[in-house]
Amino acid sequence: MLPITPIKDQGKSPLCWVYAMLATIEMEHLGQGDSVNLSVDYISRMFLEEQAMKRFSTKGSHDISLRGMAPMVIDLLQRYGAMPYDSYFSREPINYNVLSRKIEKTVDMCLAHRYDSVRCLDEVRYQLNENIGYMPSMVFMYGMKYTLLEFAHSVCLPDEYESLTSLEAEPVNKVIRLPFADNHYDITALNIPADSLIKRMEHSLRKGHPVLWEGGPEDNHAVAVIGMGSDNTGTEYFIAKNSWGKDNPTKGLLYIRKDYV
């Protein structure tokens, strides 16, 4: 099993896709001898801010949603940068479902008062500052100063990760748009047979690379796969770092049957 960074807890939020992608990036760096712990709150904040302004620009027709797909995190990193966990985290657990409703009401208030986009963004940021915390403008690490984008590029380049999927209803060995409602950024992936996907996952793990897995009956959970194992009946599993905290029998890990994957 690969070494892992600290287990986090997404609470009741649907932000597993952020937790899982950042965990994958963190553990890729661990494999290179580099320790990095990234801020989920920062990426979640920027996505929520983006959703808020989309609601404003559509005059309230866009519903704010915290759901997404893990590869979207790569896009968010390239747009807004990144922060270390210690630089930006809430000292009290945040109910992001409540916060998203609060932001939605803030945008609706701005629309009702006919505020322009600049003032609306100020109002949204005020709420985010009050509920998550004020953001540093720079990242300081190891005696060096980085902009948020510089720091993001130091931990993840735009084309560093490859997106693969296995969908029977889609053309095989073709790059397709992932046909899920949570795909807000028109993310694409190479569609390959299921057995090929499993082999690629196994190969990556044996080479010391974590694998981001996103799946379920309705593409409804994302985790960072860190190893393989089997039980006393011979059933094979992928072992994953989950984002449901450590107060559970598996101490924050998730065991996924290979035939389920």
Can you describe what each PLM-predicted range is?
Residues 1-164, 205-207, 243-250:
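Active-site nucleophile-adjacent alpha helix/oxyanion-hole segment immediately C-terminal to the catalytic cysteine
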Residues 5, 122-261:
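Active-site signature of cysteine proteases
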